[in-house]
Amino acid sequence: MNDQTPDRYVTFMGIACDTNADRLCEMLAARMAGNDSRWVAYFEKKLAENAQMGHDRLRFIGAQVNALMSFFEEEDDEAALALLWHIEHHCL
């Protein structure tokens, strides 16, 4: 590549994958709080399993992309969907 665009197949430098994963998980937690969606119990279980296995948030997002997309679509959360798309296409 001759341009300055970060290439995830070469390095994750300059992409801020961990920071973006943290932001998305914060957005998820905020949406889950006080929510009666069927997704809340699902994500609570998956987040607990992820923590128990010692996996990071980026690993969690990679494993849950489709479920996260469905939940954020259900919640009409365009910002979370945009960030999820960015993570999926630049970090996973």
UniProtKB/Swiss-Prot annotation:
Keywords: Nitrogen fixation
Top-level taxon of the source organism: Bacteria
Iron-sulfur listed as a keyword: no
Keyword Phosphoprotein carried by entry: no
Cystine pairs: none
Gene Ontology biological process: nitrogen fixation
Family: Belongs to the CowN family.
HAMAP family: CowN
Function: Is required to sustain N(2)-dependent growth in the presence of low levels of carbon monoxide (CO). Probably acts by protecting the N(2) fixation ability of the nitrogenase complex, which is inactivated in the presence of CO.
Protein name: N(2)-fixation sustaining protein CowN
Upper classification of the organism: Bacteria, Pseudomonadati, Pseudomonadota, Alphaproteobacteria, Rhodobacterales
